[in-house]
Amino acid sequence: MTQDQPIAPFDWFANQFTSKRGEEFIEKIYPYMKAYLKPGDRVVDLCCGAGSITIFLEEQGTQVTGIDLAPGLIALARQEAVKRGAKANFIQANVLTYPLGEGIYDLAVCFGNAICDFPHQSFPQFRDRVFDALKPGGPLILEYIDGLRRVAFMSEPKEVVEQGLDSQIVRRFIEYNPVSSAFKVEYHRLSTNETYEVTEYVYIGPLIRLLMEVRFEFVQSTRLEHSFMDVYIKR
């Protein structure tokens, strides 16, 4: 998520980022990403959530830094790391502004459809920061939900009741704006009667590849159950 988005709704759903869900997701993605991992690699997990993937990567013998803007998720990540004896480093920061360094990472990953929180005009900033942080030939693994599927589901106002960390949450899809390729989503937590509105941006594979090819070479795209996982190599 970016600094102009309210953080609270992401913390409300912290239970969806914790170990069990993370383990189920890892089972799906690891067969496709293990070719890009080797012991001793330095890895950065961008928009890492509660850190289940970050910690898993550290347990494969890599040195991992996880970055996320939501303080509640980073707190959960640190707790889980202590519980599992992991040495993964977690930083609460905006991935669009946090200094990642230059040429220090062997691999960058960004899972959980996190890019939908990036305004389209900010994506080149994200791309360039990852490019600078990677070593020559370093891969970026990017996982996302196809935006057209999301538009089809959310093009009409509707409500979905979901279970958050401590209460039920009503997620209401308000409207889709075809000009900005974004839609408004309202989150309402029943236990505290709090409401936040966020903007989610639509990305599709061809658009992502068009934005990425300026500095990265597209390698492959893998269809998962509800999303796609693309691999790009730093030119």
What are these regions (language model features)?
Residues 42, 137-139:
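Short glycine-centered segments of the SAM/dcSAM-binding site in methyltransferase folds
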Residues 1-38, 40-49:
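Conserved class I S-adenosyl-L-methionine
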Residues 100-108:
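A short acidic, Gly/Pro-enriched loop at the edge of an enzyme's catalytic core
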Residues 141-210:
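SAM-dependent methyltransferase
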Residues 216, 223-235:
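Core SAM-dependent methyltransferase catalytic element
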Residues 52-97:
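Class I SAM-dependent methyltransferase SAM/SAH-binding core
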Residues 124-136:
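A short glycine-rich, Lys/Arg-flanked "PGG" loop and its adjoining helix->strand segment in the class I
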